A protein has these predicted regions:
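Short beta-strand-loop elements within alpha/beta enzyme cores
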Residues: 59
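Helical "lid/coupling" subdomains associated with nucleotide-phosphate turnover
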Residues: 1-56, 71-227
């Protein structure tokens, strides 16, 4: 119903919305992640990551149905987007497909991570340039939630730019994956709407860090609207 939706929006707003392509969305996501912040919306906010990072950067957005990868390069406070890919790997998709027990059984978790790794391998075989990234930046709800669980609270100022080591991410994954949903609901950093899907989302992030050799990940609250 995309066409009818756009027509209706146009009638209400008096202007026709522009639908961005997948590549353009990836570029905007990358630029927003590295140049946006929480202090100001728009490019190169005072707390943006572009001011403190150098070299090839991979931005990862783990969504409900897919995971988006965006690669770029930072140098001298300037960001350049270079490539993108979409993986049919997502927190809701994988929860519904693999994690049927509460808490998930070990074999369910193994299947979830194995398929995530195989899907990532397919992309890396076609686009090996993603393997050049030396910094991992994660964005959006899944990434922010994992950080909030580690902090024990949700605070945008603490989350933006938060570095978590691979060991810390693995520890959060082990904790969440072995708790029943009722216990996860009492975690002060975990929003109620993410209780059922965060295990798969965290497992996808763990898989990316393991497979691509990232020692840590940075959280960015920058988004498409900051690009």
């Amino acid at each position: 119903n995309g066409g009818s939706l756009l027509a209706r929006v146009g009638e209400v707003l008096g202007t026709v919305p522009r639908v961005v392509s997948g590549d353009e969305e990836a570029r905007l996501s990358f630029m927003g992640a590295v140049t946006g912040g929480i202090e100001t919306f728009g490019p190169a906010g005072a707390d943006s990551l572009v001011a403190s990072l150098e070299g090839p950067v991979l931005v990862v957005d783990i969504g409900g149905g897919s995971t988006e990868l965006a690669l770029g390069h930072l140098a001298g406070g300037t960001a350049t987007f270079t490539a993108s890919a979409s993986l049919q790997v997502g927190s809701v998709r994988f929860t519904e497909r693999y994690l049927h027990s509460d808490p998930p059984r070990p074999e369910e978790l193994s299947d979830c991570l194995s398929v995530a790794e195989a899907t990532l391998d397919e992309v890396l075989s076609v686009q090996p340039s993603f393997g050049s990234a030396t910094t991992l930046v994660v964005v959006a709800g899944t990434a922010e939630t994992i950080g909030a669980v580690e902090l024990g609270r949700w605070d945008d100022r603490e989350l933006h730019g938060l570095a978590m080591s691979k060991a810390q991410v693995e520890d959060v994954f082990r904790t969440l994956a072995t708790e029943p949903a009722d216990d996860r609901r009492h975690n002060p950093g975990l929003p109620p709407e993410r209780v059922d899907y965060i295990v798969a989302g965290c497992g996808i992030l763990v898989t990316i860090m393991r497979r691509m050799g990232f020692a840590e990940r940075l959280v960015s609250l920058g988004s498409v609207r900051d690009a």
